[in-house]
Amino acid sequence: MPLGDPSREGAEKLPATIRALGWTSFLTDLSSEAIYPLLPNFVKGLGGSAIDVGLLDGIANAVAAVVRLFAGGLSDRIGRRPLVIAGYGLSAVVRPAMGLVATPPAAVVVRAIDRFGKGIRSAPRDALVTDLVEPEVRGRAFGHIRALDHAGAALGPLVAMLFLLAFPGTERTLFLFTIVPGLVTLAVIGRFVRDPPRQAAAGGPTLATLTGAQWSLLGCVAVWALGAASELFLLRRAEDLGVAQPLVPLVWFGISGVKSVVAAWAGPLVDRLAPRRALVAGWLGFAAAYAGLAWSPSLPGAIACMLGVAAAYGVAEPAERALVAALSPAGRHGAAFGWYTLVQGLMALPAGLLAGWLWERGPD
């Protein structure tokens, strides 16, 4: 179960496919996040700058964004499972190649292909969750998956830290080993994930299919995403305030652990309060935590604000997905999640570049 999950019984009442998707997310993030916290220093060692760090995430997410849109619409026609398998499979095979790169551009390419895989699977997976559960428990279902996702993200950096403490300077070997949980992920999907019976939709994800409420939500998501710069900058801030590089994964463990705990509790809360209210609360908390981080000169204060950012994410993520599902017409859930993830991904590039530019030129 996710870290701090308050309702094991509630999770056990979820369909087996959703429980399997939760553990799939856990395994994927276990491998992905063992790498992620090490990337800023790794790119720096390859001769990269803070702008390269912004490009690493910005380009990767932007490339995946368009794929998410078409993958979501395609899943409305051919089913969710084939695209979920393809997306997880691509990432599992490509991610270990980070251990072979020699230049910052090569690192960007590997990261982009990894995120390309995420783009293929993200919208179909969330649409599959929507297909499988009733509206009154969508918050719980998305909270369960996000909690396990972040539990994997918490343990991945911890495994990386212990590995590097035992074998200093072997980051590339660690990257290569991430193929193991990736292959286990594919085995779980192949055994447990199934599409429910449903009628295939006609046509693709066109702008004409969006309702006024969906347009409003996408506009709000775009504004929020522009201010939500890559969390790699949180790790770089921790390093600047004195956290030793081998201990940086421990910071990421704390951030992801808080996300896991809060998402597990927030899922049922979203169902009770309504997704819109929970989403506003999460976004306001996010803004307040980032404002505190900007003004905190000490490491303890900065860490507290980073954990505040994590808590806000834990509330906002299941609320966003539950609201997207609630606003999407029947048979168009894949396209709806495709548009949602498209907006998130497209805003990642300007958000990353803006954060990198401010980092390079702003006050110390």
Model-derived segments and their meaning:
Residues 164-180, 357-364:
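A membrane-interface helix-boundary motif in multi-pass transporters
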Residues 180-199:
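C-terminal membrane-cytosol helix-exit motif in multi-pass small-molecule transporters
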Residues 110-151, 323:
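Cytoplasmic helix-loop-helix junction between adjacent transmembrane helices
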Residues 61-69, 154, 256-264, 345-349:
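Residue-level signature of mid-helix packing/kink "hotspots" within the transmembrane helices
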Residues 99-110, 294-305:
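Helix-loop junctions at membrane interfaces in 12-TM secondary transporters
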Residues 82-97, 179, 277-292:
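Structural signature of the two symmetry-related core transmembrane helices
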